[in-house]
């Protein structure tokens, strides 16, 4: 019997023998692909090859790809659905097509796996007669070949656009006794008799976002076989949780909860959810996903919180997901070593997120049960669902799932309306922007598709030839003064925006014209687009041109880029090796570095990181680059950007001998660290859970920043009439004095308001059988108003108190209702809401106490006079 690890290796070796290059799994975060939330299929990392915008080093490839699909999260817990899974695949980019794909697939399942041919059926796309003929050549009887429509046998695209095509699937037949028993039962029947093993996609088209399809440059092959499903079959198990993939993880869940697997259905469901989601969140975090309110971060948060919820149903009241993740890492790190490498970070992130949700879970569940009890008409309102989401962290899908268990639905339209009120959308656009499909179209229409030769590591000026000119309308022969365009050169000293470093600016000059380069972009096929505008004259295709970059700007960028590399080493020295780069931006003015860390840096940590960088600057260490095989670079421990894809040969940038920093980098740098001159951190902040950001300046900008700080300190010292070094102490004394005076004023206000409150008691009147006290108070703040209302409520015993004042030049209202009157239907929150609306504001609160304010203080008295009409 094959183990799952043996099956994985067996498959990859089989296709290596067929001339395929083994490719490592890419990250669950798709590289440079805005059409996908997460990696959903083995072909995702190869999309540029299928689109024809990049060329693979080997046109035959095979991989075992980590995949994640979000469509069935609520279904996880049954015997079949998973979020995270492994996809075995073999791929041809314009090399072989249907004949070889079908022959090798049949050979593998019948000869390598020894699955009896009589247990196998195949399905094909309706009109794919070619595939049918090829299956027959392999000996598959016509009676076990089934034609199906697009819903079953047309694959893709992975996202809203991309490669796609008809497909053919291999199915395993468990036997007539396992299904519906009908004589005409075939793989289109959902009775459970048949199990899809392998999907062979014949990639022929590129589909755009509108659904329009165009033929790809060369037909290709994309196959996918789920390792988990294959393991079930080869280990003769009922479901994936009984295979060696999940058995150790299920065992850990049983050990933690004291429950047994296989005893009752509800316990099994909870154990499966906890185990499957633990695996999913472990891989997501290891691949760089961070819990968030949107996007892939929301998927992670949703999984983690669903796991916690079902853990509670197993009696797991204390945090348990760190232990579960440990079991996942122990089981899978032999195949995916990044799990071991990032274990500390993964576990810390899980602990933090689980603790955050645990704080609100119990209260949220109590509120949800109350909502369920009070819900009439069978539907929980969107407003209630939003409150559970916004206040208690309940993903709406989780609320929907719990509601369904109670026979209720959720008003998702109302929930979305509430979300829209809160949601802010940031959009950015560029005149020249390229998504996957648009890039393919631009490259296809170029007259010159060869890679631009970058000479900018050595040169800042270069004689070149204009190979192409692109405008919004496509390629043109010439451009004139005022025209905006992108110029393609055969050789260029301009660095194209990549790896967080901004593109170079400068000029392209010909005998007849001058072109200002405002930015330089890098297309997937290696072509550089020099974007800008014609300043004077005319530029034409095939002209010789002098390309000049802005050298001073380049030097500023180089200072910041090299400093970024040293900073990453500094952070690992100060905070620990678990620090991972999560992004960077390098501009002439400053650098921005995002990294994984769960808490704010202390002042001491910031100072130590800064001192580390400046020490390396003072040492004037050599900065040098060399090319080497990617595998050698990893063996040497060179730092690679998390989630980035690299070719077989890479450029390694080192600082110092021996190196204090060694990273894969294609950017431009100083030649010695001393050229950076000075490094200064200007801010350290949070940009999300477990994600920190440092902004820093170097060189001239650092000097300017320090000068500004010194000027500010000098001005402050003058105002305090103290020496600069004495200013902090002087300021602290002044603040203490102000705080003391504030307390004195508050005490005086409190005494005055108490006296005023005593007088107010006599103004309480009987109105509709209740005691009502409505009054405007002067010279009190909101806190004092609250204390006054407490005093009046205690003295009245029973009644409604409405007080108003002007605080910070705005009207402020406070209402209290005693318990006996709440039972009669009076509600402080409703009263304050109406008062605040009169004054141009808003407010509300609980039945017993509420407060609110407005914008127009002139409306204060009018609002108070309207109280009786509200009762």
Curated annotation (Swiss-Prot):
Its EC number is 6.1.1.7. PANTHER family: ALANINE--TRNA LIGASE, CYTOPLASMIC, ALANYL-TRNA SYNTHETASE. It comes from Dehalococcoides mccartyi (strain ATCC BAA-2266 / KCTC 15142 / 195) (Dehalococcoides ethenogenes (strain 195)). Transmembrane segments: none annotated. GO terms for biological process: alanyl-tRNA aminoacylation. It catalyses: tRNA(Ala) + L-alanine + ATP = L-alanyl-tRNA(Ala) + AMP + diphosphate. PROSITE patterns: AA_TRNA_LIGASE_II_ALA. CDD domains: AlaRS_core (cd00673). Consists of three domains; the N-terminal catalytic domain, the editing domain and the C-terminal C-Ala domain. The editing domain removes incorrectly charged amino acids, while the C-Ala domain, along with tRNA(Ala), serves as a bridge to cooperatively bring together the editing and aminoacylation centers thus stimulating deacylation of misacylated tRNAs. This is Alanine--tRNA ligase. Its cofactor is Zn(2+). The gene is alaS. It is found in: Cytoplasm. NCBIfam families: alaS. Keywords: Aminoacyl-tRNA synthetase, ATP-binding, Cytoplasm, Ligase, Metal-binding, Nucleotide-binding, Protein biosynthesis, RNA-binding, tRNA-binding, Zinc. Catalyzes the attachment of alanine to tRNA(Ala) in a two-step reaction: alanine is first activated by ATP to form Ala-AMP and then transferred to the acceptor end of tRNA(Ala). Also edits incorrectly charged Ser-tRNA(Ala) and Gly-tRNA(Ala) via its editing domain. Binds 1 zinc ion per subunit. One of its GO terms (molecular function) is ATP binding. InterPro entries: aa-tRNA-synth_II/BPL/LPL, Ala-tRNA-lgiase_IIc, Ala-tRNA-ligase_IIc_anticod-bd, Ala-tRNA-synth_IIc_core, Ala-tRNA-synth_IIc_N, Ala-tRNA_ligase, Ala_tRNA_ligase_euk/bac, DHHA1_dom. Pfam families: DHHA1, tRNA-synt_2c, tRNA_SAD. One of its GO terms (cellular component) is cytosol. It comes from the Bacteria. Zn(2+) binds at residues 561, 565, 665, 669. Belongs to the class-II aminoacyl-tRNA synthetase family. Gene3D superfamilies: 2.40.30.130, 3.10.310.40, 3.30.54.20, 6.10.250.550, Bira Bifunctional Protein, Domain 2 (3.30.930.10), Threonyl-trna Synthetase, Chain A, domain 2 (3.30.980.10).
């Amino acid at each position: 019997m094959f183990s799952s690890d043996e099956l994985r290796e067996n498959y990859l070796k089989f296709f290596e023998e067929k001339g395929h290059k083994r490719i490592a799994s890419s990250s669950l975060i798709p590289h440079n692909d805005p059409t996908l939330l997460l990696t959903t299929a083995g072909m995702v990392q190869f999309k540029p090859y299928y689109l024809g915008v990049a060329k693979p080093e080997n046109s035959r490839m095979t991989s075992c790809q980590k995949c994640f699909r979000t469509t069935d999260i609520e279904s996880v817990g049954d015997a079949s659905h998973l979020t995270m899974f492994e996809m075995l695949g073999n791929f041809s980019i314009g090399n072989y097509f249907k004949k070889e794909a079908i022959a090798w697939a049949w050979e593998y399942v019948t000869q390598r796996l020894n699955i009896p041919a009589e247990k196998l059926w195949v399905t094909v796309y309706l009109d794919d007669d070619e595939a049918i003929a090829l299956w027959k050549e392999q000996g598959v009887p016509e009676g076990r070949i089934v034609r199906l429509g697009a819903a079953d046998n047309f694959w893709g695209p992975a996202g809203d656009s991309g490669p796609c095509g008809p497909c053919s699937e291999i199915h395993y037949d468990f036997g007539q006794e396992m299904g519906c028993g009908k004589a005409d039962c075939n793989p289109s029947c959902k009775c459970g008799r048949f199990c899809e093993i392998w999907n062979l996609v014949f990639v022929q088209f590129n589909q755009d976002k509108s659904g329009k399809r165009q033929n790809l440059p060369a037909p290709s092959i994309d196959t996918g076989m789920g390792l988990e499903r294959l393991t079930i079959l080869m280990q003769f198990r009922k479901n994936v949780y009984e295979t060696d993939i999940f058995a150790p993880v299920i065992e850990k869940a049983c050990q933690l909860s004291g429950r047994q697997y296989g005893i009752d259905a509800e316990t099994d469901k909870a154990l499966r959810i906890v185990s499957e989601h633990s695996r999913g969140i472990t891989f997501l975090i290891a691949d760089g996903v961070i819990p968030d309110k949107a996007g892939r971060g929301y998927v992670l948060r949703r999984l983690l919180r669903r796991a916690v919820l079902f853990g509670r149903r197993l009696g797991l009241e204390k945090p348990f997901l760190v232990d579960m993740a440990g079991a996942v890492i122990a089981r899978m790190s032999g195949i995916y070593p990044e799990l071991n490498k990032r274990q500390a970070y993964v576990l810390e992130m899980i602990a933090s997120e689980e603790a955050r949700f645990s704080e609100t879970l119990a209260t949220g569940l109590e509120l949800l049960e109350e909502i369920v009890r009070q819900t009439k008409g069978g539907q929980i309102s969107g407003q209630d669902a939003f409150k559970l989401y916004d206040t208690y962290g309940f993903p709406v899908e989780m609320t929907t799932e719990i509601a369904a268990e109670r026979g209720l639905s959720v008003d998702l339209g109302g929930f979305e309306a509430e979300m829209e009120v809160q949601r802010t959308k940031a959009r950015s656009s560029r005149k020249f922007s390229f998504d996957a499909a648009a890039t393919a179209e631009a490259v296809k229409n170029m007259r010159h598709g060869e890679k631009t030769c970058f000479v900018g590591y050595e040169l800042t000026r270069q004689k070149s030839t204009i190979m192409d000119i692109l405008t919004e309308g496509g390629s043109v022969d010439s451009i004139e003064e005022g025209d905006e365009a992108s110029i393609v050169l055969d050789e260029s000293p301009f660095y194209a925006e990549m790896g967080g470093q901004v593109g170079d600016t400068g000029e392209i000059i010909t005998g007849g014209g001058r072109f200002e380069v405002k930015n330089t972009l890098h297309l997937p096929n290696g072509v550089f687009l020099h974007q800008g505008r014609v300043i004077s004259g005319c530029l034409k295709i095939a002209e010789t041109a002098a390309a000049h970059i802005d050298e001073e700007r380049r030097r500023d960028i180089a200072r910041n880029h090299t400093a970024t590399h040293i900073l990453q080493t500094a952070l690992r020295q100060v905070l620990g090796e678990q620090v991972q780069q999560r992004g960077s931006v390098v501009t002439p003015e400053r650098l921005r570095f995002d990294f994984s860390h769960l808490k704010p840096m202390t002042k001491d940590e910031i100072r130590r990181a800064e001192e580390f960088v400046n020490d390396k600057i003072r040492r004037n260490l050599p900065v040098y680059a060399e090319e080497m095989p990617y595998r050698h670079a990893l063996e040497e421990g060179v730092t690679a950007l998390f989630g980035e894809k690299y070719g077989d040969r890479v450029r390694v940038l080192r600082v110092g001998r021996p190196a204090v920093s060694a990273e894969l980098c294609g950017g431009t740098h100083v030649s010695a660290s001393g050229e950076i001159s000075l490094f200064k951190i200007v801010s350290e902040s949070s940009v999300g859970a477990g994600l920190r950001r440092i902004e820093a300046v170097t060189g001239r900008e650092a000097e300017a920043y320090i000068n500004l700080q010194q000027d500010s300190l000098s001005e402050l010292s003058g105002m305090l009439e103290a020496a600069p070094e004495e200013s902090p102490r002087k300021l602290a004394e002044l603040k203490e004095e102000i705080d003391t005076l504030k307390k004195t004023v508050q005490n005086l206000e409190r005494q005055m308001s108490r006296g005023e409150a005593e007088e107010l008691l006599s103004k309480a009147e009987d109105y509709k059988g209740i005691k009502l006290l409505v009054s405007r108070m002067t010279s009190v703040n909101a806190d004092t108003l609250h204390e006054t209302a407490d005093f009046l409520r205690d003295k009245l015993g029973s009644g409604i108190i409405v007080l108003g004042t002007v605080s910070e030049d705005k009207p402020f209202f406070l209402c209290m209702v005693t318990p006996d009157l709440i039972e009669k239907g009076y509600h402080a929150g409703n009263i304050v809401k109406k008062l605040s609306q009169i004054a141009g504001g808003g407010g509300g609160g609980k039945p017993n106490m509420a407060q609110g304010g407005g914008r127009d203080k002139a409306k204060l008295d009018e609002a108070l006079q309207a109280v009786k009409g509200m009762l």
